[in-house]
């Protein structure tokens, strides 16, 4: 199916709906205009009481003389008439064109307003300026019909010409009732339509999916960078929507469902939008949480309504973001099989591949928790194809940066390949944030273009947080932080299998970091060896060991370091088989492969004995203790470098990789320290200053 056809179909649907609404409102306006016209006609019609009409008929027996319009003259009467909702004293005369109907008497009269004469107020005379002729009047008759006979006899006796009114037609007889009923029906329809609209309190069972046309999306595969493999996987879906006959003549069928899995921020939603933009078909977008409601059965009703809307516009795409909110494994909830979420999931399973499933609807979904999804949802026939949208490699990051810097004025010295190299592990959202941070920093510094310095500072802001220059520490705490970070940097520089140190700083950043040591990998890594994990543990422990060597006590600042080191050691024992317990896995994990913290997946220890658990704890303690001894030995040998680096940090607060290398090379007693190759008798520097441990510990 071509792109033009999809857009035209959706535009026609919208145009028909708009025309129907316009016609409805025009009809509603016509009814209101008719009622207003009837009200205006009645307002300008003079009402005459029955008794006044009898008096006027009796007075009309005499010869009327308009030159003698005085009180008591024949042919007229003085009455109080209600005209235009105002009660006035009027003189009524010249009764004519009388029409006698079953419920009312109509005709024409002449009216002239009376004005008081003198100050007593008992004399009135007509005001010729207010004379109105041919005024329509109406006198209502009683339902019993006796008044009609009496007034007809009086009119005949007065020789006043009259005629009987024609019998009222069905419309005239029931016009007010019909108009009132139409108005009430129109009001009820509008109220029900408003209540049933999305977002209203009564729209329980209606789907909250939003329909997008191709021109509203404006996104194609050219806007998607860094995930070329994922794009190639989904191109077949677009090709099928454009020309399905190519696949059908070979007996093939398009996947009914495509599941996009990957870490947050990698572009899963963007890829789905690009598919809809390329295919040119209607695109329904909604979140998994849109099906969840406090009322029982609402989620299943919304699923059915969503597919009904989609089938009416097939071929089309339904995109469900955050599918894990809807499709978690059944039976895991507290409420068991009667859980509302499970009813919603069952409805989705039936709609995707049941007796009444529609092949013209393609379901796409995105999640970063595929391990929590129900197996029935992932089987072939529902989500046939699983597309991994993983973190981009260095080439992918460079392509993503090229997309985001299109509207950014860059300095000629900016090398996007270098920026991609210093951002391993960054996803598309991180890189977009990095470019924006660099542009903001350049604007804050009144620069005309964004340079490499802004990108480097942006990387630090994204990874370590914002600098807290107003957070002032006392000299004792600042010195302790300097030794702590110097210990990290020195051990990371000395050990093999560690990432190069890019920067050491004692400027507080983020929420709780009083200092940081930034290491940048030289490339993308997918595996870690046992020696690399041990080196990482030693780097984490170096800060607190440096504090202990210099100050003979430790502070609370190493809390996060100890937590991370212990976690690595425990995983080495329980998951990776890197301990004396052998190549055995002791943990059943439901951790997410795409979330940095593992998500909230449940982890439990396999059925092992108490003795094995005790041995695991002993192995964790052994790995930590051996790492502490190695770190202590390195820092004892490199104490001169530790003190020199600390003094430099106290002066400038930040040391980059080049200056770090210079300081360590100048104060090193020999080649780089490698565990197991240290000289037996290594002399310490005799020029080291003596530092007294402060009494105040660093917190946080």
Curated annotation (Swiss-Prot):
<dbReference type="InterPro" id="IPR027417">
    <property type="entry name" value="P-loop_NTPase"/>
</dbReference>
<dbReference type="InterPro" id="IPR003960">
    <property type="entry name" value="ATPase_AAA_CS"/>
</dbReference>
<dbReference type="GO" id="GO:0006508">
    <property type="term" value="P:proteolysis"/>
</dbReference>
<feature type="topological domain" description="Cytoplasmic">
    <location>
        <begin position="1"/>
        <end position="20"/>
    </location>
</feature>
<protein>
    <recommendedName>
        <fullName>ATP-dependent zinc metalloprotease FtsH</fullName>
        <ecNumber>3.4.24.-</ecNumber>
    </recommendedName>
</protein>
<dbReference type="Pfam" id="PF00004">
    <property type="entry name" value="AAA"/>
</dbReference>
<feature type="topological domain" description="Periplasmic">
    <location>
        <begin position="42"/>
        <end position="171"/>
    </location>
</feature>
<dbReference type="GO" id="GO:0008270">
    <property type="term" value="F:zinc ion binding"/>
</dbReference>
<keyword id="KW-0472">Membrane</keyword>
<feature type="topological domain" description="Cytoplasmic">
    <location>
        <begin position="193"/>
        <end position="700"/>
    </location>
</feature>
<dbReference type="InterPro" id="IPR037219">
    <property type="entry name" value="Peptidase_M41-like"/>
</dbReference>
<dbReference type="Pfam" id="PF01434">
    <property type="entry name" value="Peptidase_M41"/>
</dbReference>
<feature type="binding site">
    <location>
        <begin position="262"/>
        <end position="269"/>
    </location>
    <ligand>
        <name>ATP</name>
    </ligand>
</feature>
<dbReference type="GO" id="GO:0016887">
    <property type="term" value="F:ATP hydrolysis activity"/>
</dbReference>
<feature type="binding site">
    <location>
        <position position="561"/>
    </location>
    <ligand>
        <name>Zn(2+)</name>
    </ligand>
</feature>
<dbReference type="InterPro" id="IPR041569">
    <property type="entry name" value="AAA_lid_3"/>
</dbReference>
<feature type="transmembrane region" description="Helical">
    <location>
        <begin position="172"/>
        <end position="192"/>
    </location>
</feature>
<keyword id="KW-0645">Protease</keyword>
<dbReference type="InterPro" id="IPR003959">
    <property type="entry name" value="ATPase_AAA_core"/>
</dbReference>
<dbReference type="GO" id="GO:0030163">
    <property type="term" value="P:protein catabolic process"/>
</dbReference>
<dbReference type="GO" id="GO:0004176">
    <property type="term" value="F:ATP-dependent peptidase activity"/>
</dbReference>
<keyword id="KW-0547">Nucleotide-binding</keyword>
<dbReference type="GO" id="GO:0004222">
    <property type="term" value="F:metalloendopeptidase activity"/>
</dbReference>
<keyword id="KW-0482">Metalloprotease</keyword>
<feature type="transmembrane region" description="Helical">
    <location>
        <begin position="21"/>
        <end position="41"/>
    </location>
</feature>
<feature type="active site">
    <location>
        <position position="485"/>
    </location>
</feature>
<keyword id="KW-0997">Cell inner membrane</keyword>
<dbReference type="Pfam" id="PF17862">
    <property type="entry name" value="AAA_lid_3"/>
</dbReference>
<keyword id="KW-0378">Hydrolase</keyword>
<keyword id="KW-0862">Zinc</keyword>
<dbReference type="InterPro" id="IPR005936">
    <property type="entry name" value="FtsH"/>
</dbReference>
<keyword id="KW-0812">Transmembrane</keyword>
<feature type="binding site">
    <location>
        <position position="484"/>
    </location>
    <ligand>
        <name>Zn(2+)</name>
    </ligand>
</feature>
<dbReference type="InterPro" id="IPR003593">
    <property type="entry name" value="AAA+_ATPase"/>
</dbReference>
<feature type="binding site">
    <location>
        <position position="488"/>
    </location>
    <ligand>
        <name>Zn(2+)</name>
    </ligand>
</feature>
<comment type="similarity">
    <text>In the central section; belongs to the AAA ATPase family.</text>
</comment>
<keyword id="KW-0479">Metal-binding</keyword>
<comment type="subunit">
    <text>Homohexamer.</text>
</comment>
<dbReference type="InterPro" id="IPR000642">
    <property type="entry name" value="Peptidase_M41"/>
</dbReference>
<dbReference type="GO" id="GO:0005886">
    <property type="term" value="C:plasma membrane"/>
</dbReference>
<keyword id="KW-0067">ATP-binding</keyword>
<keyword id="KW-1133">Transmembrane helix</keyword>
């Amino acid at each position: 199916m071509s792109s033009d056809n999809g857009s035209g179909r959706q535009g026609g649907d919208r145009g028909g709906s708009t025309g129907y609404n316009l016609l409805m409102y025009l009809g509603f306006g016509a009814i209101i205009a008719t009622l207003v016209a009837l009200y205006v006609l009645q307002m300008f019609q003079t009402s005459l009481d029955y008794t006044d009409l009898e008096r006027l008929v009796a007075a009309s027996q005499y010869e009327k003389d308009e030159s003698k319009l005085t009180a008591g003259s024949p042919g007229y009467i003085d009455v109080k008439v209600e005209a235009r909702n105002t009660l006035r004293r009027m003189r009524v005369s010249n009764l004519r064109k009388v029409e006698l109907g079953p419920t009312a008497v109509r005709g024409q009269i002449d009216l002239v307003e009376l004005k008081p004469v003198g100050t007593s107020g008992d004399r009135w005379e007509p005001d010729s300026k207010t004379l109105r002729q041919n005024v329509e009047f109406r006198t209502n008759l009683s339902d019993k019909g006796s008044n009609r006979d009496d007034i007809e006899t009086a009119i005949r006796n007065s020789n006043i010409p009259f005629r009987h009114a024609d019998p009222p037609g069905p419309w005239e007889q029931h016009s007010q009732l019909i108009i009132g009923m139409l108005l009430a029906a129109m009001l009820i329809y509008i109220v029900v339509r408003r209540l049933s609209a999305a977002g209203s309190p009564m729209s329980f069972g209606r789907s909250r999916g939003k329909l997008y046309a191709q021109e509203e999306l404006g996104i194609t595969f050219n806007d998607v960078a860094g995930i070329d493999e994922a794009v190639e996987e989904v191109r077949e879906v677009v090709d099928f929507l454009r020309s399905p006959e190519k696949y059908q003549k070979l007996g093939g069928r398009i996947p009914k469902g495509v599941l996009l899995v990957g870490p947050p921020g990698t572009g899963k939603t963007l890829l789905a939008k690009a598919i809809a933009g390329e295919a040119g078909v209607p695109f329904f977008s909604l979140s998994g949480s849109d099906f969840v409601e406090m009322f029982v059965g609402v989620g299943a009703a919304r699923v059915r309504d969503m597919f009904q809307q989609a089938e009416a516009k097939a071929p089309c795409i339904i995109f469900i973001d955050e599918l894990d909110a809807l499709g978690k494994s059944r039976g895991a909830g507290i409420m068991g099989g009667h859980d509302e979420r499970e009813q919603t999931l069952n409805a989705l399973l039936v709609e995707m591949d049941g007796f009444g499933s529609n092949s013209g609807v393609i379901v796409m979904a995105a999640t970063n928790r595929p391990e929590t999804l129900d197996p029935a949802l992932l089987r072939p026939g529902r989500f046939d194809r699983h597309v991994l949208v993983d973190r981009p490699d260095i080439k992918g990051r460079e392509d993503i940066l090229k997309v985001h810097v299109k509207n950014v004025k860059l300095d000629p010295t900016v090398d996007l390949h270098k920026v991609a190299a210093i951002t391993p592990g960054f996803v598309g959202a991180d890189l977009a944030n990095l470019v924006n941070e660099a542009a903001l920093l350049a604007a804050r510094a009144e620069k005309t273009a964004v340079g490499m310095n802004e990108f480097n500072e942006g990387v630090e802001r994204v990874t370590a947080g914002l600098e807290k220059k107003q957070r002032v520490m006392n000299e004792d705490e600042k010195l302790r932080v300097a030794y702590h970070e110097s210990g990290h940097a020195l051990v990371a520089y000395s050990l093999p299998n560690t990432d190069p140190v890019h920067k050491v700083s004692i400027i507080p950043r983020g929420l709780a970091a009083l200092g940081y040591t930034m290491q940048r990998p030289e490339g993308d890594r997918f595996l870690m060896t046992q020696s690399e994990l041990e080196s990482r543990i030693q780097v984490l422990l170096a800060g607190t060991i440096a504090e202990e060597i210099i100050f003979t006590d430790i502070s609370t600042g190493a809390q996060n370091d100890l937590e991370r080191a212990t976690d690595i050691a425990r995983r080495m024992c329980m998951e990776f088989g890197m301990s004396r317990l052998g190549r055995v896995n002791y943990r059943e994990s439901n951790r997410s492969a795409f979330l940095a913290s593992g998500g909230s997946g449940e982890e439990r220890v396999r059925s092992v004995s108490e003795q094995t658990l005790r041995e695991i704890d002993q192995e964790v303690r052994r790995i930590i203790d051996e790492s502490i001894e190695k770190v202590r030995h390195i820092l004892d040998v490199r104490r001169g470098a530790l003190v020199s680096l600390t003094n430099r940090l106290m002066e400038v607060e930040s040391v980059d990789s080049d200056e770090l290398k210079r300081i360590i090379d100048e104060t090193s007693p020999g080649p780089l320290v490698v565990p197991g190759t240290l000289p037996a008798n290594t002399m310490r520097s005799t020029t080291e200053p003596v530092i007294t441990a402060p009494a105040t510990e660093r917190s946080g």
